[in-house]
Amino acid sequence: MLIGGRAHAVAEAEFIAQAGFPFAEISIRTPQEFKREVASFRRLQDRFGIFYVAHGPEEVNTWEPEKLRADFLPLIRSLLDCAAELAITVFTLHFWLDRRFVADDIAAEKIEILKAMTGHADKCGIKLCIENLSEQVSDFPPVFAVIEGLGMTLDVGHGELLTARNTAYEFAAGWPERIWHVHLHDNRGGDTVEDDLHLPLGEGVIDFAAILGCLRKQGYDRTMTLEIATAALKSGKNIIEQTWQHEAPAA
């Protein structure tokens, strides 16, 4: 299991590399921005031996599949091509499918768009991973049933939103073979975008020992990104390592 940090800019990736983390999760938002930054990211790779996972741009036109197909799909294809230039093998995507807010007919069209994205990711040698935003575990079976190559990024902090019990427990138990990456940050519950606080670990209400125990019991042994401020990364890494080794039960 490898722990990395979230980098929204090259300077943050450099901080993460200098701090000794094995990887950074970088934002790839537009091909133009990527072309300006790719040389800097490569220098960090050469200097520190760091590797990258990627986070795509925010979804737009959530309820307009025709615009997603016309604009967002080609954008994601281009960004997957960019990611391949840095030998990135995991690409996280926001693509909201919470059936409490996205109608079934729109969700069905979005799943077809997601299938096309996943097909392009496969050609690039990249695992495309849909991230849980507010979705329940019941929202994902129709997706995974028709998109064999799609992975999941389990966001533990998001799991605390719009629910009485963190959904990470059910995701870890129900879809262990799909979970390719994990996001870690603390939250205090709530039901709005503003409630997604991305707090340092220990400043919210999430029971990380219990959730990490579920993941470890299912045999998870891939990457985890701390999606918190860079100043809190080292302490967050220590918390996760100690919890994983001493508190989370072994499989």
Regions found by a protein language model. Name each.
Residues 1-2, 9-17, 87, 137-154, ...:
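Histidine-acidic metal/acid-base catalytic patches
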Residues 42-59, 111-121, 147, 208-213:
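Alpha-helix-loop-beta-strand connector modules within alpha/beta enzyme cores
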Residues 5-7, 26-30, 52-58, 93-95, ...:
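A cross-domain feature marking catalytic cores of carbohydrate-active enzymes
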Residues 22-23, 51, 89, 127, ...:
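Residue-level detector of anion-binding/catalytic polar loops
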Residues 1-80, 84, 151, 249-251:
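N-terminal pre-domain/capping segments
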Residues 60-66, 99-103, 162, 190-198:
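A short acidic, helix-capping loop that chelates divalent metal ions and anchors anionic groups
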Residues 64-151:
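Active-site acidic/histidine proton-transfer and metal-coordination neighborhood
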Residues 38-42, 68-77, 106-115, 164-173, ...:
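Charged helix-capping and loop-helix junction motifs
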